[in-house]
Every structure is written in structure tokens, then in C-alpha cells.
């Protein structure tokens, strides 16, 4: 698995585009780094930049971004609504894949040390990178903000982890908080009020830290302390969430600004529902939600499925539709258009040019795909067509499940059919991917024929490559057979238990799946026949025969159930 990390620095400039552009350019200049998002905020005078890549390039880009921010931002002149302590205020490293949080913490500490040694920027290490337990909390590191730095840097207990005395460099650049944490979602909830105090009250209700306990529970009551003389806190309802309330000039209303630090414990939709509940309890309403930066796709998928479940609607619909439900349900497009292609990290990490090649066939129209198949080009051929027939079989079974899930009078069975539809959607996606993979496997064989064969060594290399490519070309249609076979039990269940009016559709689903299976089997056999060494193909051929036998038996059951419905 490729080692990928994300970096989401916050720079203390949200108004001067030339400064923002220069910082982003410094980051993007590092080879292997992809800038995914730049989100400036005028009211907060702060810009959040998101970039990803392998660890070494990302750390280098983070360093260069901090150096450019130090050059262009003078903290002595900075004012904004958001707490801040430096030109580069926070600089977190976040594991995405193939790397642990602990490894990111080590990288963060090394980055902080380098920033001080080479740039003279004082650095605090927070969250997983913290050297002191209390500094796991960013608020502790940033306490007093920029204005408190001279005093903090003179205090041995509060001085930065890397940094000396207050000097000209610190005065200009401030201090940077370098850390490592799991994926964090920053989200703002607009309220139908201009009252900062009421927004703060909602924030206190929901944030994990909660609010200070007061005598009688009143706003002005005496602060309550425990037997040790320490302040008593009333915890909020959302674990791992930090929140404050403030007034935003840009929108002319107050909002609750929240960081969700553990999306497994508190998913985005859970936080949204709780903020809405807390606001309503105080006579307020959430009027719009904005996600700052990016989110993993699963955050929105989980949200969409949550709201579909509340509606007792099938979850077996397209990914695009699930995302649409999530966006509408959480008012993500009330403030401005919300485009998942621009806000979901997985979409932004995709190389569109590479994706266009990999999905060349499935991106075609039905007419275009048929025309391409009919052309004199040998690909797409029977293997791709077999995968597509299998995909259509899975799609038809899914359609019957969705129709049954929403059938009047069957409300109590919606989950039963939704589960079938979800399985069908997954199989359809798998088989559609095999449409292009089968053609890619054929092209791999063709590429081998263009390899040089002038010397004995070249001939041997060419023969070995051709043997490997041919075996791969035999294995791909077997994957098609396996996937299409899984569609048949779904078709059978829908033929037996689904909406009777759609029985014929379940029958066609089975016929299409079996056609895909038998067509793919021919491709397994013809490619296996092209191998010099037939031994590796023996288990493939044996499995293909078993799949055909199982598929034909299931097809008979489906057609029997369908004919029973038709003849009633």
C-alpha cells in the first residue's frame, strides 16, 4: 500500500490573494505533492490549505510553505476572528494510507525542529506529536495567542518545544503549532441569530469540554469548584468535539465553529443532528452548514445512508445519489454550492487523465459502446461484453430490489430489499470495472508482440512477458464469472420474494448474468489455450466449469419462479 499523508496548514492570511498564491505555489513546487484545496476566509483572515502525497515530499512542502509564510506575513499587523499564534498557525500531518499516526508524529517533531533550526520559527508540538501530555490539546499550546508569546517564551514551563528567547524572527512569524492527528473535520453551523452569546451557549452544550459549572446553573452564578479548589466543568454531549460561537461579518449572523477530532466516534451527521437539537432547545435554528477543507468520502456516504435509513428508503442506490442525500440533509449547499468532486479527498486525489484511460469504455454512451464494439478494432471484445452483460444482470436485480423496497404496503420490509440492492450495487460496480480491465488485459498481450526479439535474451524476455500477460488475460474473465455468479442469488430472491410486477425483470437479470458467465468462460478457455505451460491454467478452467454448473442451476430456479408469477 502506498504511504500517503495529508497536511492541512492554516496560514494567518485570508484577504491578500497574492500572499496566499505565493504560499500555495511554494507548496505545489515540490514534486510528488498535490494541492487539493485552498480555502481562504476573509472574516477570519485565515487560509486553510490541504495537500497530500508521500511522507517525504509532504514534509518538504510543509517546510517551504512555512518559510514563504514567514517571508510574507507579519504577525504584528495581523487581525482576524480566529485564534492564532503564528504566520503558519497550525501545521498538522495526518495519516491517509500505509502509515501510522505514530510515524506521522515522528515526522511532525522532525519538521518542528527543522523549522526552528533553519528558519528560527518557534514551534510547539501538539496532539500525537506532543512532548508533554497537556500539549496534546492545541488550545493549551495556543493559549493567549500571538500576543502572549513574549511572556510564554520567557517561562520555562510554557516556552515552545523548539525555540529560544523572544526575538525579531518570533515577533514577525509568531509561533507555529506542529502536530499529528487523525483525520479532523472542521465545520461551521450558521444560526438564525446575531447573538454571539447564544451561539457560544450552543457550542458549550455540545463540545466535549462543556461549560464551567455555576451555582444554581445560572449564567451569573458563582463558579463551582471541587474539594481541590479546581473548576468544575459540565461536559457537553459530543465526545472529541471542540466548538466555539462567534459572529461572522461576512454572513451577518452568528455561527458555531466546530472541530470533530474523531469521526469514528462522532460522525459528521451525528454532530449535525446534535447541534440542531441544541440550537432548537434554545429557540434557534441551523440555517446552513459549511465544511472547511476536505472530508473523506465515507463521511458523506455514512451520512447519506443515515438519512435514507431514517426515511426507510433503500440504500442500494448510486454513490452520487447517496452523496446528494447527505448534502441536502445537512444543508451543505445552503451557503454556497457544494460539489463533492471539489470537497471529497478521494475524488481530488484521482488523476483525471489516468482515470479517463482506465474507464474509457464505461464512460461511453450505450450507443458509443456498441459502435466501438462493432468497429474493426479487436477490443472491446467478448470479455468486456461478458462483463457488461453481468453488470446489467446485477443492475436489473438491484432495480427489482429498489422497487420492492418502496412498494406500497411493504414498508416493514424495506430493509430486507435495501440489503439486496446494496449488494447489487457493489456487484454492478465490480463488473463495470471489469469491462475496462478485460480490454486492458487484451492490450497487454498486444504490447508483448511489439517487444524486440533480435537476440536470444530478447526472445526469452518477450516469451516470458507474453506467457504472463496471457495468464492474466485468462484470470480476468474468471473474475467476471465469480462476480456475475453472485448476482444470481439476488435475482432468485427477487423472483421469489420481490415485487410480482417485476418478476420478468428478475428473470432477465438471471439470463443476462448467465450470458455474461458463459461468455467469460469462453474467454478463460481461449486464453488458457494460448499458454505454453498449461499447468497454471488448470485451476482456472476447473473453477470456470464449476461456476457454469452452479449458474445454470440457479438460472433454472429463477425462471421457474418467474414463470409461476406470470402464469398465475
Protein language model annotation of sequence segments:
Residues 1-368, 375, 453, 461, ...:
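Long, contiguous binding/interaction regions
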